[in-house]
Design a protein with these regions (language model features):
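N-terminal Sec-pathway targeting helices
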Residues: 1-17
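Solvent-exposed, non-transmembrane regions of membrane-associated and secreted proteins
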Residues: 17-166
Length: 166
C-alpha cells in the first residue's frame, strides 16, 4: 500500500474503534440504570421478606411503610422475575420513572392508579416491559402454553390479606 492507502486504512480502523466505543458506552448507559434498579429491588426483597412461601410470605409491612408510604401491596408470579412492591401515588404516573424510594429510575416501579383498590372489579397494574425480563418483561414467557400451565398463579399481597389469581 502507498501512503494514501495507509492513511485510509488507519482512518478506517480509527473510525471503527471509535464507533465500537460509542456503541459500548451507549449500551452501558442504557443497561446500567436498569440493572441498578433491579439490584435495589432485590435488596428490598431480602430486607422485607423474612419467610419465602408463595401462599403466605411474611412481609415486613412496617419496614416497607417506613421506606415509602405509597407501597400498598406486593406482586409475585412464581417462575418469573415478577416479585415487586406495588406503589400508588397521588398522580397516576408518579412511579412511571421513579423507584420505590421515589428517586428517578428509568425502569420505574410497578404501580396502580390513584383511587384504585384491589376490591375493584378491574384493576390495571402498570409497569415497564423490560427486554431483559425485569419488571413485566417476563410476561412474554406466558405466550407459551406449556409455561402458562406450569406457572398459572399470581399472588397479590397486602397487609393481612393475600389474593391468589389463577
Amino acid at each position: 500500500m502507498g501512503r494514501i492507502g495507509d492513511f485510509f486504512y488507519h482512518l478506517t480502523i480509527t473510525i471503527l474503534v471509535a464507533a465500537a466505543l460509542v456503541f459500548l458506552l451507549m449500551a452501558f448507559k442504557e443497561q446500567y440504570p436498569i440493572l441498578k434498579n433491579q439490584q435495589e429491588l432485590e435488596d428490598l426483597q431480602s430486607n422485607v421478606e423474612t419467610k419465602k412461601t408463595n401462599d403466605n410470605p411474611h412481609i415486613n409491612w412496617k419496614k416497607l411503610k417506613r421506606i415509602n408510604q405509597d407501597i400498598i401491596a406486593w406482586i409475585k408470579v412464581p417462575g418469573t422475575k415478577i416479585d415487586y412492591p406495588i406503589l400508588q401515588g397521588k398522580e397516576w404516573n408518579k412511579y412511571l420513572h421513579k423507584n420505590y424510594e421515589g428517586d428517578y429510575s428509568y425502569a420505574g416501579s410497578i404501580f396502580i392508579q390513584p383511587g384504585a383498590t384491589f376490591d375493584d372489579s378491574h384493576l390495571i397494574i402498570y409497569g415497564h416491559n423490560m427486554r431483559v425480563k425485569y419488571m413485566f418483561g417476563s410476561l412474554h414467557d406466558f405466550e407459551s402454553e406449556n409455561f402458562y400451565k406450569k406457572h398459572n398463579k399470581i399472588y397479590l399481597y397486602q397487609p393481612g390479606k393475600t389474593i391468589k389469581c389463577t
